[in-house]
């Protein structure tokens, strides 16, 4: 796929299975879709020259997780930021032609050094692909960081996602 950026409407189409074809990777539907747009995606950028993704999520106080996490102390769950990075890694694999359904396979290290609150405006996700395997199993490995309003608050090393044409034994 030659397209290098995606709107929210296009990401929603991906969540419905309308982007990469039947049986292939989808993004989650709302409320679990953790980005509003992909600003840039490529196959040869990033720190390792294996690919790069930059995406954003607009923050507003009405987002579903602020009402339940936590009452009187609203904060976006850190695991949602981690999931967003896995979502983007899987999207990159499908965008680069990988067949199958995306599944998170792990992460080497995650650090949280800040939080996302209702008064913040924008979350930015950055993924540097460090390894892309295109064999029987399509698998991507990458390092990610999350920023809120321009300040780095999460980092993740060795995020792993695979694409599976058969998930019955996974």
Swiss-Prot record:
EC number assigned by the record: 4.2.1.59, 5.3.3.14
InterPro entries attached to this UniProt entry: FabA, FabA_FabZ, HotDog_dom_sf
Gene3D superfamilies for this protein: Hotdog Thioesterase
GO MF annotation terms: (3R)-hydroxyacyl-[acyl-carrier-protein] dehydratase activity; trans-2-decenoyl-acyl-carrier-protein isomerase activity
Cystine bridges: none
Stated role: Necessary for the introduction of cis unsaturation into fatty acids. Catalyzes the dehydration of (3R)-3-hydroxydecanoyl-ACP to E-(2)-decenoyl-ACP and then its isomerization to Z-(3)-decenoyl-ACP. Can catalyze the dehydratase reaction for beta-hydroxyacyl-ACPs with saturated chain lengths up to 16:0, being most active on intermediate chain length.
Identification of the protein by name: 3-hydroxydecanoyl-[acyl-carrier-protein] dehydratase
Organism: Idiomarina loihiensis (strain ATCC BAA-735 / DSM 15497 / L2-TR)
């Amino acid at each position: 796929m030659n397209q290098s950026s995606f709107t929210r409407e296009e990401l929603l189409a991906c969540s419905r299975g309308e982007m990469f074809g039947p049986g292939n990777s989808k993004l989650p539907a709302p409320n679990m879709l953790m980005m509003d747009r992909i600003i840039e995606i490529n196959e040869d950028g990033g720190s390792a020259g294996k690919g790069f993704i930059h995406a954003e999520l607009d923050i507003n106080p009405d987002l579903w997780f602020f009402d339940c996490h936590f009452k009187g102390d609203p904060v976006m769950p850190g695991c949602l930021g981690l999931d967003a990075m896995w979502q983007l890694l899987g999207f990159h694999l499908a965008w680069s032609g990988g067949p199958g359904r995306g599944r998170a396979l792990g992460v080497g290290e995650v650090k949280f050094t800040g939080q996302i609150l209702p008064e913040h405006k924008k979350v930015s996700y950055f993924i540097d692909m460090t390894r892309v395997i295109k064999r029987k199993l399509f698998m991507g490995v990458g390092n990610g960081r999350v920023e809120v309003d321009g300040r780095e608050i999460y980092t993740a090393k060795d995020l792993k996602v695979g694409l599976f044409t058969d998930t019955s034994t996974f």
